[in-house]
Amino acid sequence: QNKVRGNLIRLGGFAADFVDRIMEPIVGMAEPFRYRNKAQFPIGTDRDGQPIAGFYAARTHSIIPVEDCLLGVGENKVILDAILEYMRAEHISAYDETTGKGLIRHVLIRYGFTSKELMAALVINGTRLPHQEALIQRLTQIPGMKSISVNCNRENTNVILGEETICIWGTPYITDDIHLCDCSDDRFIQ
């Protein structure tokens, strides 16, 4: 709380007496895990050429495989496992930033805490997803799945999403009780 107060005064330029008058006590989270409603995972390959999902190592583009991030919902792991299994079974390649080759670049997942609806979006380096019915069959087995999309990003860029998103199953959005806003893959909601 003192750090926030100090930053408001030092960085924000607010008068100390003003901050002291309006600032309320900071309340911690009752449960500091599994609270994120959106996750995005880069897709790459391990040393054996097998597809992996994870996070970038600090200040690099090297992917550290992550089986489960405790900030995201448990369904993230189930969805990633299904996508990686699909990639292995159908011989779908992961994107390689160095060569610009390979198909699957990222996976974005959204979860509606009130609606219990799930959205999965695959960002691809192409215009179509081979054997997409096999992927749909896997993902629709997951309770709550409402939306499966493919986003096309063929640019050599570190921007995750491309211009075009195609809903390949379900609806192009999920709904949650955030003032009943439709949540698509490119919207920021927290």
Residue map of PLM features:
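Accessory RNA-recognition modules of RNA-modification enzymes
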Residues: 1-190
